[in-house]
């Protein structure tokens, strides 16, 4: 198998450009809720022209952080508001739901995209709040589909998430695995110590971005099934 980083260090650091005012803008929600014993990530993906903006937040378990002793300054990032450290046996799905509810007061969340794993727990809670939830049955299957766009967004400097070292870390922890049959998979460089939740949440949102975040209204209406 061929392996490589999903983006160069220079490309990742270029994403740290300040995000513009996106008040009331339409966006796609992304969610990675699979690892409720360590990290969970949520986010909103916006588009303006060729540029995409990713506003994200994470939740991490206090007990996990104490035992894992990760190298990055997680507590410092928490102080900056990039993530919330919770003291509970597993990450309560209501943290995720409440975050999207709060964001809905500021932005127009068209849809929330997540993988099927553990979605049975959180989907009813999101739908009870009136959110439209789309599930991805096999996340790795969409990686190959999105790989050309992901590569282009990084290479052409069209993706931004503001000054967010946590998101940088997530992205540095991803490697692009190309299988013998040419399929692309975004995998963790280390299964236990290299978290990728924020990146995977963004990939989930990107899956629906071309359908929802478009300037071509006629095309969008054609795609809808009333």
State where each predicted segment sits:
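Metal-dependent DNA phosphodiester-chemistry modules and their immediately adjacent helices/loops
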Residues: 125-215
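Short His-Asn-centered micro-motif
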Residues: 33, 114-117, 136
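Acidic two-metal-ion nuclease catalytic site recognized across multiple nuclease folds
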Residues: 3, 7-10, 206-226
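Gly/Thr-rich phosphate-binding beta-strand-loop-beta motif of the actin/hexokinase/Hsp70
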Residues: 22-54
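Nucleic-acid-processing active sites and adjacent nucleic-acid-binding tracks
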Residues: 46-111
């Amino acid at each position: 198998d061929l392996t490589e980083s999903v983006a160069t260090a220079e490309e990742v650091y270029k994403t740290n450009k300040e995000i513009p005012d996106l008040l009331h803008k339409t966006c796609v929600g992304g969610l990675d809720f699979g690892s409720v014993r360590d990290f969970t990530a949520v986010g909103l993906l916006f588009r303006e022209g060729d540029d995409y903006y990713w506003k994200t937040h994470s939740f991490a378990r206090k007990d996990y952080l104490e035992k894992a002793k990760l190298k990055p300054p997680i507590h410092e990032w928490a102080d900056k508001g990039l993530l919330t450290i919770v003291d509970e046996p597993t990450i309560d799905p209501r943290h995720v739901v409440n975050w999207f509810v709060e964001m809905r007061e500021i932005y127009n969340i068209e849809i929330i995209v997540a993988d099927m794993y553990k979605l049975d727990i959180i989907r009813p809670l999101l739908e009870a709040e009136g959110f439209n939830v789309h599930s991805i049955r096999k996340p790795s299957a969409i990686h190959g589909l999105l790989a050309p766009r992901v590569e282009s967004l990084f290479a052409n400097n069209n993706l931004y998430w503001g000054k967010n070292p946590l998101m940088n870390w997530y992205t540095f922890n991803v490697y692009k695995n190309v299988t013998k049959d040419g399929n692309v998979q975004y995998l963790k460089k280390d299964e236990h110590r290299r978290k990728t939740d924020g990146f995977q949440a963004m990939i989930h949102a990107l899956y629906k971005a071309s359908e929802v975040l478009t300037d071509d209204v006629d095309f969008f209406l054609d795609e809808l099934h009333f």
